[in-house]
Amino acid sequence: MTDLPDSTRWQLWIVAFGFFMQSLDTTIVNTALPSMAQSLGESPLHMHMVIVSYVLTVAVMLPASGWLADKVGVRNIFFTAIVLFTLGSLFCALSGTLNELLLARALQGVGGAMMVPVGRLTVMKIVPREQYMAAMTFVTLPGQVGPLLGPALGGLLVEYASWHWIFLINIPVGIIGAIATLLLMPNYTMQTRRFDLSGFLLLAVGMAVLTLALDGSKGTGLSPLTIAGLVAVGVVALVLYLLHARNNNRALFSLKLFRTRTFSLGLAGSFAGRIGSGMLPFMTPVFLQIGLGFSPFHAGLMMIPMVLGSMGMKRIVVQVVNRFGYRRVLVATTLGLSLVTLLFMTTALLGWYYVLPFVLFLQGMVNSTRFSSMNTLTLKDLPDNLASSGNSLLSMIMQLSMSIGVTIAGLLLGLFGSQHVSVDSGTTQTVFMYTWLSMALIIALPAFIFARVPNDTHQNVAISRRKRSAQ
């Protein structure tokens, strides 16, 4: 990339900045949840909604981000994304109640939903095609550093300052990024087709109310009738979308995607798989602090081996999949992650704390292998004319399943414990034990889906290439 103009390199730095902000925010909050609960006078069992409100908003807004960038311009949308994310951070820091914090996190989520996909689109437009992979590697590297720094930095700020600072640090970074975007980034636009607003609203309503109904089933004060009504509204909205998308060439996501078997299996497996693994980043720091009495900083440091294991495994995951095939790798990593989850719970409850970093490192390796395999399985056989739509749907499902996973984790804690779980409670470790056992079972269930994946990987790739070349 040394032969790129200086202006283009600066634009890549801006995109990388945005990737870093978004990835840091996804991990820095987890370590601070117990301190937030104490400061806001809430039960720790309710704090999962701080994560859910952000991730669910990202899932809802993702389908609109690419269309908005093409219609209004990548600079205008990227600038708007940074401003919304920064304002959301400010309002998070100023929040005095849990409801205020949830609204502020939703505003952050709107910005976060546009930042990464619009950043990818910007890179596609400003660099030559032959340098696109090198440019994407450059801008996504800070996004890999964010999860590494997030837990420890969050714990450090909480322990030696206050939880408000995990949001306040975004403000100067956001201001610099917004100004640089206005000054340096070109405002590319493209001719767009009409946006599928009806489909977007149906999907948004369906995802939001079903998640709310799931969360409302324990300890929120919603009546059974209200919850049943929410479920009915959500199901009707999703069924209406299916009817809307049938034979509709302008649908947000074409139903033709599901004619590709590996896409259908991969998407179903990704949804179920990320529900289970989405619980882990929320539950692990909460368990370390509330269940075992770790300090926020110590709990944050304990998360670093998991990220290192994930980053290290990315270097060899392709060779592993090529050697053993998708079916074997996905079934083995799914069951393996369930066993590692049980191992983490056992070693922690036995007090073998010196073993935990190694267990978390192993967890990161297994999880990374499964994530990469699920992503490539889902998209690898799609024809070229459906690849972009399939990738967008996969991104939305990834965020949605993570929000559902965190919601279920909070639901399990509320089911097995009281509304006042604390370090001083004699039953706290028992509550967490039952929760971890349930999580291990949920994590293992997608193995039944992955067992149906065709095993001849190389043949599938060849078939896929012949299909694409024939179109």
Swiss-Prot record:
Q: InterPro entries in the record, alphabetically?
A: EmrB-like (IPR004638), MFS (IPR011701), MFS_dom (IPR020846), MFS_trans_sf (IPR036259), Multi-R_MdtD (IPR023721)
Q: Which residues cross the membrane?
A: 12-32, 49-69, 77-97, 102-124, 138-158, 165-185, 197-217, 225-245, 263-283, 286-306, 342-362, 396-416, 431-451
Where does the UniProt entry say this protein principally localizes? membrane
Q: Where in the cell is it found?
A: Cell inner membrane
Q: What are the protein's UniProt keywords?
A: Cell inner membrane, Cell membrane, Membrane, Transmembrane, Transmembrane helix, Transport
Top-rank taxon, per record: Bacteria
Inducing or repressing factors = Transcriptionally regulated by BaeR.
Q: Which residues lie on this side of the membrane: Cytoplasmic?
A: 33-48, 98-101, 159-164, 218-224, 284-285, 363-395, 452-471
Q: Give the Pfam families listed for this entry.
A: MFS_1
> Which GO terms of the molecular function aspect are on file?
transmembrane transporter activity
Q: Name one GO cellular component term.
A: plasma membrane
Q: Name one GO biological process term.
A: transmembrane transport
Cited CDD domains? MFS_LmrB_MDR_like
The UniProt entry's sequence similarity note says: Belongs to the major facilitator superfamily. TCR/Tet family.
Q: Which PANTHER family match?
A: BLR6921 PROTEIN, MAJOR FACILITATOR SUPERFAMILY MULTIDRUG TRANSPORTER MFSC
This one is known as Putative multidrug resistance protein MdtD
- Naturally occurring in which organism (per UniProt): Escherichia coli (strain K12)
Q: Taxonomy-wise, where does this protein's organism fall, top ranks first? A: Bacteria, Pseudomonadati, Pseudomonadota, Gammaproteobacteria, Enterobacterales
